[in-house]
């Protein structure tokens, strides 16, 4: 049956029995396709019936359906004609793991950063009203913790103040809400959604209040009783107090019930919340039995067992986790904070070992940063572990609440640089540019596991301001020993005997391995290269300027955007000291990169050892620092 679904219109003629069969097919399809590519499995298994109902009730794309977060949108993609593309999920030139307007007119927003869809919905509803499109509904599906983000409640406050047709579907796949009791609550919820209910209610208010002497008193008594019953029976007070209509909770795996609720909500033609309770990982035993996160996201797995088909080597995240636990065992002032991601950021083990010193604040990076500031004021040393891409949300708090007060808060940025398969919104290529403008901020970029352990310890010894440590996703690789340490800078390679000091190659973090490979290529062409790892990359260590005076060209190599990164900082530091040595940078272009593997993205922008060696050769030749173009070109090719 799934093969016959080319678009939402094909769902309209299906019977309830056929919809149930289709739901089973969709789950089987998801399990086998995501098992082969990796992706967000658990959340999508939980929204099958909900997504079917959404596309039967609303007219997408005429009625925008916005997913928050977008990793819940796999079934939506399937029902809008993209089943055939799932073999390429999260691969180069393939299907995105999030909604993508480049893929389909049914995808309005990319929505991989949580808690934003309601603000989009508010804006779209206003735009439709101003354009005279009064028959268009905007649907926001908010779930997987997105409602723990403050931006959602800012948007709800604005949506509630209008009469615009915004339908807010709360996909509750956790245990945040208690179940509603009995049929009376269901009756109240259904009644409140009837379009004529408000008219009748208003007439009743006027009639009771019009009774001489006791009318207002009677109305207030009746209203108080109604509110008390409502709050006792339904977990809706947080919405109704804002002025939003509410229905639910609805069994999210009963397609007929969900569809009925959505049709009532649509007919109301004003802001309404539909509370749908779903089970993450529904229908797949390995996910349902995963107590940690119901297989929220997985790599390539065996679809029968749910087990990974290969075991990765030691990763950056696990190395950080082990190091933090070791240090916390020696110091009771070390506390850890995460924004709803204890597993992905490596803090689950810390939570288990030190539960009283671990704080999961939900999807609330802004609160996380200022709460960390308060902890630091109280004598603790907080470690805030988040993905690099989510640092953007906490910039004001980091600048004004942490740095302004010179507080010892350590921010650990996982998934820095190019992450790859999750696409543009998850690449952590902005952090150095952001951190570089924060007064008093010190930033480390470890090149290997040994340096991560070392620099984490150094960060936790800082007591007069904030620190940050950034590292990428994936395996940590082999340790890269230094020849010597000059000041705070590790020297990894020097020109061979008899060669001149032509190029100072400044490698940021894990790009140290690439820098050494580039130096080998250049040595074969007679170009002498010194490779250094600054370790603490911002502010630029003094030793970099000293080393620069001995070379003819300085080149920085980093996986940050070219504007505002280490390259810009090194160039600025040399200008400040009036050191007249040319600087060049090999960095990421300042643009958004589509999903692909990390290696594919780096290759597409020329950040490979061969291409960088060719670039440096050209720069050296242009400066007249070494051999002629023709001889160099022959060696490069």
UniProtKB/Swiss-Prot annotation:
Cited Pfam families: DXP_synthase_N (PF13292), Transket_pyr (PF02779), Transketolase_C (PF02780)
Catalytic activity field: D-glyceraldehyde 3-phosphate + pyruvate + H(+) = 1-deoxy-D-xylulose 5-phosphate + CO2
Pathway connected to this protein: Metabolic intermediate biosynthesis; 1-deoxy-D-xylulose 5-phosphate biosynthesis; 1-deoxy-D-xylulose 5-phosphate from D-glyceraldehyde 3-phosphate and pyruvate: step 1/1
Residues reported to bind Mg(2+): 144, 173
Entry cofactors: Mg(2+); thiamine diphosphate
Keywords in alphabetical order: Isoprene biosynthesis, Magnesium, Metal-binding, Thiamine biosynthesis, Thiamine pyrophosphate, Transferase
Co-factor binding details: Binds 1 Mg(2+) ion per subunit.
Residues binding thiamine diphosphate, per UniProt: 71, 112-114, 145-146, 173, 284, 365
InterPro entries for this protein: Dxylulose-5-P_synthase, THDP-binding, Transketo_C/PFOR_II, Transketolase-like_Pyr-bd, Transketolase_BS, Transketolase_C, Transketolase_CS
SUPFAM superfamilies named among the record's database cross-references: Thiamin diphosphate-binding fold (THDP-binding) (SSF52518), TK C-terminal domain-like (SSF52922)
Function: Catalyzes the acyloin condensation reaction between C atoms 2 and 3 of pyruvate and glyceraldehyde 3-phosphate to yield 1-deoxy-D-xylulose-5-phosphate (DXP).
Family: Belongs to the transketolase family. DXPS subfamily.
Classification via NCBIfam families: dxs, PRK05444.2-2
Subunit structure: Homodimer.
Protein name as it appears in the record: 1-deoxy-D-xylulose-5-phosphate synthase
Annotated organism of origin: Mycolicibacterium vanbaalenii (strain DSM 7251 / JCM 13017 / BCRC 16820 / KCTC 9966 / NRRL B-24157 / PYR-1) (Mycobacterium vanbaalenii)
């Amino acid at each position: 049956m799934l093969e016959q679904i080319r678009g939402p219109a094909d769902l309209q003629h299906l019977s309830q029995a056929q919809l149930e069969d289709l739901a089973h097919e969709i789950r089987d399809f998801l399990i086998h396709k995501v098992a082969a590519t990796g992706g967000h499995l658990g959340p999508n298994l939980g929204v099958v019936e909900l997504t079917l109902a959404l596309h039967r009730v609303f007219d997408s794309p005429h009625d925008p359906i916005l997913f928050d977060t977008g990793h819940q949108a796999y079934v939506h993609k399937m029902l809008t004609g993209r089943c055939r593309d799932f073999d390429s999920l999260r691969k180069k030139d393939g299907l995105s793991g999030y909604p993508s307007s480049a893929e389909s007119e049914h995808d309005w927003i990319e929505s991989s950063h949580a808690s934003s869809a309601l603000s989009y919905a508010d804006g779209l509803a206003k735009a439709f009203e101003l354009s005279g499109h009064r028959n268009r509904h905007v649907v926001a599906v908010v779930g997987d913790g997105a409602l723990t983000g403050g931006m959602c409640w800012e948007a709800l406050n604005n949506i509630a103040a209008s009469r615009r047709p915004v339908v807010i579907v709360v996909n509750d796949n956790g245990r945040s809400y208690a179940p509603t009791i009995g049929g009376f609550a269901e009756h109240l919820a259904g009644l409140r959604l009837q379009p004529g209910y408000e008219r009748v209610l208003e007439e009743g208010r006027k009639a009771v209040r019009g009774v001489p002497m006791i009318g207002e008193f009677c109305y207030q008594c009746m209203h108080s009783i109604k509110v008390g019953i409502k709050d006792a029976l339904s977990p809706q007070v947080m919405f109704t107090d804002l002025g939003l209509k509410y229905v639910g909770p609805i069994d999210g795996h009963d397609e007929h019930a969900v569809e009925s609720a959505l049709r009532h909500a649509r007919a109301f033609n004003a802001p309404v919340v539909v509370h749908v309770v779903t089970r993450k990982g529904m229908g797949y035993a390995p996910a349902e039995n995963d107590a940690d996160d119901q297989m929220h996201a997985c790599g390539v797995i065996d679809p029968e067992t749910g087990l990974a088909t290969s075991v990765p080597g030691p990763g950056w995240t696990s190395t950080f986790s082990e190091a933090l636990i070791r240090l916390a065992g020696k110091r009771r002032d070390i506390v850890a904070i995460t924004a709803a991601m204890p597993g992905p950021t490596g803090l689950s083990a810390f939570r288990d070992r030190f539960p009283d010193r671990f704080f999961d604040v939900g999807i609330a990076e802004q609160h996380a940063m200022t709460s960390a500031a308060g902890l630091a004021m109280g004598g603790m040393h907080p470690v805030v572990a988040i993905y690099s891409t989510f640092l953007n949300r906490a910039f004001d708090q980091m600048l004004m609440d942490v740095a302004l007060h010179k507080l010892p808060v350590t921010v650990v940025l996982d998934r820095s640089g190019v992450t790859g398969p999750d696409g543009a919104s998850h690449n952590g290529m902005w952090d150095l540019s952001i951190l570089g403008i924060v007064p008093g901020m010190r930033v480390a970029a470890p090149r290997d596991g040994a340096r991560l352990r070392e620099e984490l310890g150094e960060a936790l010894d800082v007591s007069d301001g904030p620190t940050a440590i950034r590292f990428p996703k994936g395996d940590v690789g082999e340790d890269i020993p230094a020849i010597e340490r000059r000041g705070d800078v590790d020297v990894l390679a020097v020109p061979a005997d008899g060669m001149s000091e032509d190029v100072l190659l400044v490698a940021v973090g894990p790009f140290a391995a690439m820098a050494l490979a580039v130096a080998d290529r250049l040595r074969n062409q007679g170009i002498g290269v010194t490779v250094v790892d600054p370790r603490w990359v911002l502010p630029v260590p003094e030793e970099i300027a000293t080393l620069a005076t001995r070379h003819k060209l300085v080149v920085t190599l980093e996986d940050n955007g070219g504007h505002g990164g280490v390259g810009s900082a090194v160039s600025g530091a040399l200008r400040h000291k009036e050191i007249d040595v040319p600087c060049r940078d090999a960095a990421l272009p300042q643009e958004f990169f589509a999903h692909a593997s990390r290696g594919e993205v780096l290759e597409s922008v020329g950040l490979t050892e061969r291409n960088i060696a060719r670039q440096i050769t050209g720069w050296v030749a242009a400066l007249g620092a070494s051999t002629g173009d023709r001889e160099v070109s022959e060696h490069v090719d």
